[in-house]
Amino acid sequence: MLDWNPALYRRYEDERTRPAQELLARVPLPEAARVVDLGCGPGNSTELLANRFPTAKVVGTDNSEAMLASARERLPQARFELSDIATWAPQDQAPDLIYANAALQWVPDHEQLIPRLFAALAPGGVLAIQMPDNREEPTHRLMRAVAAEAPWAEPIGNADRLRTLLLPLGGYYDLLAPAAARVDVWHTIYQHPMADAAAIVEWVRGTGLKPFVDRLPADLQASYLAEYERRVDQAYPVRTDGKRLLAFPRMFIVAQKKA
């Protein structure tokens, strides 16, 4: 997959930052010395963490050079590192908070990943995770449906496999509960008013649609996006104010390690 586009991602930054704020609000730590923001993107979540824990050493990690450049421009005083979550491990002392907002859905093998991240915490530390749970929403079902048709099917191939199939929420609880002092899990469906079908397509182009479009040559990108937008227009009815409501389910997990 090509590198991420921070400018495209930030077009809906307020909507993307809201679940990050709500995840952080449920972190049961009055203070923290070491905080890691896994998959920090353009630094919007890292900024929240730095404001919540002003005396902490906050480190943002991402596997995208473009996202890290955007994050460094936003927070020049913060520390950012190029890193793959699948192989990440603390470089020195164990962190008090490992925070991953809208990142782990791109990382495979959650049955091994989640316990490994939890084990990396300091005693009493917290693992906080938010992941989009929208694979069966019309936006994502239509991505796959159009991608399965000619002339797009052959170049797109198995792009959908780049995103991990999430466990049921109870599955994450079961992974963490035996070693945790407390586990808090919940599910929220946001309803985002969008101007039109084109705005919905623009939103998902910054994330979930990217692996599909990246595999297409320029001429097929245009036709794929046009057909996808046509179907999105049919799937999301116009509301009384002329807008569309984009339902966006998200999964939240906050687990605290025993002291």
From Swiss-Prot:
GO terms for molecular function: trans-aconitate 2-methyltransferase activity. InterPro entries: Methyltransf_25, SAM-dependent_MTases_sf, Trans-aconitate_MeTrfase, Trans_acon_MeTrfase_C. Its EC number is 2.1.1.144. Its main location: cytoplasm. GO terms for biological process: methylation. Belongs to the methyltransferase superfamily. Tam family. This is Trans-aconitate 2-methyltransferase. It comes from Variovorax paradoxus (strain S110). The gene is tam.
